[in-house]
UniProtKB/Swiss-Prot annotation:
Superkingdom of source: Eukaryota
Protein species of origin: Homo sapiens (Human)
PROSITE patterns: ANK_REP_REGION, ANK_REPEAT, BTB
Protein name from the UniProt record: Ankyrin repeat and BTB/POZ domain-containing protein 2
Gene: ABTB2
Transmembrane segments: none
Claim: Calcium is one of the keywords in the record: no
Keywords, alphabetical: ANK repeat, Repeat
GO molecular function: protein heterodimerization activity
Pfam families assigned: Ank (PF00023), Ank_2 (PF12796), BTB (PF00651)
Length: 1025
């Protein structure tokens, strides 16, 4: 029976190393399908209700005795399940995160566009902002582990971390969002210091705060700005994905339209039913994948062989092929297996199906893959054995092998079903690890890393930098070439073991290139020794003739596993990355170029210099050593190859140290004397040269004898100032300002925002004093939308008189010296007009007014046509009293004021009227009451002409109460123009700070902000267009 059993199985070698993974003649029936699965048919209505077929739910099959019995087991309502999760390690609770609830609310509103969609309640926004923290921690933890390899976090580590944590569909969406943000950022390189990173990327979340959070959580000692942009874009995209799914479930038709408000309960319901979101947003350390809150296993809809009802190319598929296709979906949801052969068969068929449906690798351009078709990923035998260790089930082993009796007693507890990820997730995570290594083979290390991520209570160290050869590439070589490759692998292993006495034999085994041979990662033995800090081996390799300045190649089929960010690195670069100062000194003494490949390479060999890497890490000793050997902190600014670097994440050394908050390193860099090199000017700089020189001279004269900065160093320090302000290192920003580096408006606003949020009012005061040094050409929309809002917020909350006086000076400065816009007259002719002789004349009068006990005679025909107020008054009087009484009493108005108002009506205008100054406001009130717009506007003009420091506050209140907007606007301009002096008056302070203003419905500070914003926009922005 054993022989019969074994004869039905393929060998492990056949299952893992044959051409069936990518060949078209193996598992051919997997491409055939003639019907949907029953499970999908049952769940199609549920998917339609959700509006988007994100996931397909599969029911269990009537299988025989294999791993498919574990699929979609109904989770019993057992309190032990809750107790089980309570014992699982939980994610850390951090106090600070790089967003606020307001930021999340703005992202949710931005996603709605111009459509009228249900709004998220405040509680739902608060709940979502809290749940996002867990997703961020998961991605950050994986990026932190991936960054160990090169002691550096780039966009590649962030993108791989997102793919590890999120499902394929969600990760692809996040990758597209990151690509969009990075593209916008690169295309806006010309506005570098004028706009914030988030504005340049088109993001709502703050890229600067994300960068600072990554530094504070020590994801790596070096953080690239593109890594922060990618992480910001991914988290913002996650909010938009959640919003879209909530909207799809909120409306019956799935289009998102509908009334009402999205509650926190509705949000949680959508997340609990979504297998892509629920596990990611749980508080446990291990990642729950492919399951929703009910424990239902799920498969991505786009991966399902039955998705969309697509049929195979052979319509005559037999029943066996249909059954095989149906079982494939169940196979991917298996949580345990009974034998290594079964696992090998499942993995092989799944890989074949994946490569058939997804010919393009995620994140790679179709054009590049058309030139270099992607090779299929294979699984090494040790990877399958390791995976089987985590998926094996003793009971199923006994069922698979009739010769194996089940154990009478077990020494180990089986993991509960809720803790078992499906096979699909094991494969997804392991393949992602292999792809991050640029390897075509999944090895046992990838499986161990996946187990650490997917299972609770497991841990292992991150992958270390060591020689690795692509095992699958050997199979594509002939016997002789494969032998040479294995010998080369042996030579690297001999050198990697640390025995210097084997160096000659190892060099002989490496092949014709000898000690300069490169492995699949494009690295030489000297690079590995430098990364490991092995001084003895480095010295031996140098003595053996190793090339010190050889670079990691850019793109080469001979080296398929090169990490994209390591291209053009030299041995010195690796030593600096890992902080081995003794090895750095050894290489420099031996003649290694201190700038790495930045000078020796060709035009396409962009790479960060060792000094840039040391500056980013804050390694003071390394920076000092490299500077003493002639490293140039301004090398990137000089553009040695004559090409821009906006696509290369380029930052100069000053920027690296400032961005990471290393003040001591920045100070050390500043001690380096300026080199006497001719400044290369752009056309914009040539045209603005006169203005900038005068500005720079004025800046330098205010400081205590600083050395005059060259144009190149000024530009570099201004860039460093930008990064320190964006990332919240206000002390570094102020220190650079003290050197005479001129302000950019955005840098000033960010520094003020940080200082205010930290309640550092001494810095706030210093910044406010320095506002006048910013050139008016810098004033832009950011000053209108953010700068003024920030300054008025400070004015509302500050109790420091000095700060308040500085703000008043700034507001007056921004308002400008030009006069306040005058109030225009209303040229309006009255519809009817009588001779002035009839004014208060009893003759022919048909209506009488009683004002202060005195009668005033008038004529209806004139009054009714003068305003709707008079017409309504006449109509109401006739209906109430009939013709018995024609006297209308006017209260709360003086007789002579009423008389002047009537004089305006009978004279037909204001030309012949003489209005005493003391009566202007009362006449304005009367004109407003009786809706005489022209008279009211004339009174507003008279008030504006007589406005003084003493009467301004009272006039403003009158204008607000009696609906005189033009006069109120004029008063606000008067306030802004004389604000510093007005702040000395109690009446003005009571107006802007007192509670009585709020009781009266006044918000003078908001009105002042709006008026100043319009003024700045018209004077400084619109006029330049």
């Amino acid at each position: 029976m054993a022989g019969t059993y074994s004869s039905t199985l393929k060998t492990l070698e056949d299952l893992t190393l044959d051409s069936g993974y990518g060949a078209g003649d193996s598992c051919r029936s997997l491409s055939l399908s003639s019907s949907k699965s029953n499970s999908q048919a049952l769940n199609s209505s549920a998917q339609q209700h959700r509006g988007a077929a994100w996931w397909c739910y599969s029911g269990s099959m009537n299988s025989r005795h294999n791993s498919w019995d574990t699929v979609n087991t109904v989770l019993p309502e057992d309190p032990e399940v809750a107790d089980l999760f309570s014992r699982c390690p939980r994610l850390p609770e951090l106090e600070e995160f790089p967003w606020t609830e307001g930021d999340v609310a703005r992202v949710l509103r931005k996603g709605a566009g111009g459509r009228r969609l249900p709004q998220f309640s405040a509680e739902a926004v608060r709940r979502l902002a809290g749940l996002l923290r867990r997703a961020l921690i998961r991605v950050a933890r994986e990026a932190q582990r991936l960054s160990v390899l090169h002691a550096k976090c780039t966009r590649f580590e962030v993108q791989s971390a997102v793919r590890l944590v999120h499902s394929w569909a969600l990760a692809e969406s996040c990758a597209l969002a990151a690509v969009k943000a990075l593209s916008l950022y690169s295309m806006s390189a010309g506005d570098g210091l004028r706009r914030g990173k988030s504005a340049r990327c088109g993001l709502t979340f703050s890229v600067g705060r994300f960068f600072r959070w990554m530094v504070d959580t020590r994801i790596s000692v070096r953080i690239h700005e593109y890594a922060a942009i990618s992480l910001t874009a991914c988290m913002e995209n996650l909010v938009e994905e959640i919003r879209a799914r909530v909207m799809a479930s909120h409306s019956p038709d799935g289009g998102g339209a509908g009334g009402g408000e999205v509650s926190a309960e509705a949000l949680e319901m959508v997340i609990n039913n979504d297998a892509e979101l629920w596990g990611v947003l749980q508080p446990y350390e291990h990642l729950i994948c492919g399951k929703n809150a009910n424990g239902v296993l799920s498969l991505p809809a786009y991966f399902s062989p039955y998705n969309g009802g697509s049929l195979g190319h052979d319509e005559r598929a037999d029943a066996y092929a249909q059954l095989e296709l149906r079982t494939l979906e169940q196979s991917l949801l298996a949580t345990c297996v009974g034998s290594i052969s079964e696992l090998s068969d499942l993995v092989s068929r799944a890989m074949h199906h994946m490569q058939g449906r997804h010919p393009l690798c995620p994140g790679a351009s179709p054009a590049r893959q058309a030139r270099q078709p992607p090779q299929p990923i294979t699984w090494s035998p040790d990877a399958l054995h390791t995976l089987y260790y985590f998926l094996r089930c003793p009971q199923m082993e006994s069922m698979e092998n009739p010769n194996l009796d089940p154990p009478r007693m077990t020494l180990n507890n089986e993991r509960p079903f809720m803790l078992l990820p499906p096979l699909m997730e094991w494969m997804r995570v392991a393949i992602t690890y292999a792809e991050h290594r640029r390897s075509l083979t999944v090895d046992s290390g990838d499986i161990r890393q996946a187990a650490r991520l997917l299972l609770p209570g497991l841990d292992c160290e991150p992958r270390q930098l060591k020689p690795e050869h692509c095992f699958s590439s050997f199979r594509r070589l002939d016997a002789r070439a494969a032998t040479e490759k294995f010998n080369q692998d042996l030579g690297f292993r001999m050198l990697n073991c640390g025995r210097t006495d084997l160096i000659n034999q190892a060099i002989e085994a490496l092949g014709p290139d000898g000690v300069n041979t490169m492995d699949d990662q494009g690295m030489t033995p000297l690079m590995y020794a430098c990364a490991a800090g092995d001084e003895a081996m480095v010295q031996m390799l140098i003595d053996a003739g190793a090339n010190l300045d050889i670079q990691v190649p850019s793109n080469s089929p001979r080296h398929p596993s090169i990490h994209p960010d390591s291209r053009h690195w030299t041995s010195l670069t690796f030593a600096v990355l890992h902080g081995h100062i003794s090895v750095v000194q050894l290489l420099l003494d031996a003649g290694a170029h201190v700038e790495g490949s930045a000078v020796n390479g060709g035009e396409d060999s962009y790479a960060e210099t060792p000094l840039q890497l040391a500056s980013a890490a804050g390694n003071y000793e390394l920076v000092s050593l490299l500077l003493s050997r002639g490293a140039d902190p301004l090398l990137s600014m000089l553009e040695a190859h004559g090409m821009g670097s906006s696509l290369h994440e380029d930052m100069n050394c000053f920027s690296h140290s400032a961005a990471h908050g290393h003040r001591n390193v920045l100070r050390k860099l500043l001690t380096q004397p300026q080199q006497a090199k001719a400044d290369v000017l752009s056309l914009e700089e040539i045209l603005a040269e006169g203005v900038e020189e005068s500005d720079a001279s004025s800046q330098g004269s205010g400081s205590e004898g600083p050395v005059r900065l060259s144009r190149t160093r000024t530009k570099a320090l201004q860039e460093a100032m930008y990064y320190s302000a964006e990332h919240g290192y206000v002390d570094i920003t102020m220190e650079l300002r003290a050197l005479g580096v001129p302000w950019k408006l955005h840098i000033w606003i960010e520094s003020l925002r940080t200082s205010f949020s930290q309640s550092r009012y001494s810095v706030v005061q210093s910044l406010l004093r320095d506002f006048s040094s910013i050139r008016e050409e810098e004033y832009n929309e950011e000053l209108v939308t953010e700068g003024l809002q920030l300054m008025f917020d400070i004015l509302k909350t500050s109790k420091n008189d000095s700060v308040i006086q500085q703000l008043a000076t700034i507001f007056t400065h921004c308002y400008g010296s030009s006069p306040i816009p005058s109030i225009p007259e209303i040229r309006k002719t009255l519809p009817a007009r009588l001779d002035p002789h009839f004014l208060n004349n009893k003759e022919m009068s048909d209506v009488t007014f009683l004002v202060e006990g005195k009668l005033f005679y008038a004529h209806k025909v004139l009054l009714v046509t003068a305003s709707n107020r008079f017409k309504t008054l006449m109509t109401n009087k006739s209906e109430q009293d009939g013709d018995s009484s024609k006297t209308i009493e006017i209260s709360d108005m003086k007789y002579h004021i009423f008389q002047m108002m009537m004089q305006y009506l009978y004279y037909g205008g204001t030309e012949s009227m003489e209005i005493p100054t003391t009566d202007i406001l009362e006449l304005l009130s009367a004109a407003s009451l009786f809706q005489l717009d022209a008279l009211q506007r004339h009174c507003e003009i008279l008030c504006s002409q007589t406005l003084s420091m003493e009467s301004a506050v009272n006039t403003y209140k009158y204008a607000k109460i009696h609906n005189a907007p033009e006069l109120a606007l004029f008063c606000e301009g008067f306030f802004l123009k004389h604000m510093k002096a007005l702040l000395e008056q109690d009446a003005f302070r009571q107006l802007i700070y007192g509670r009585s203003s709020k009781v009266q419905g006044l918000d003078p500070l908001q009105d002042l902000q709006n008026t100043l914003a319009e003024r700045v926009h018209s004077v400084y922005i619109t006029s330049r267009v």
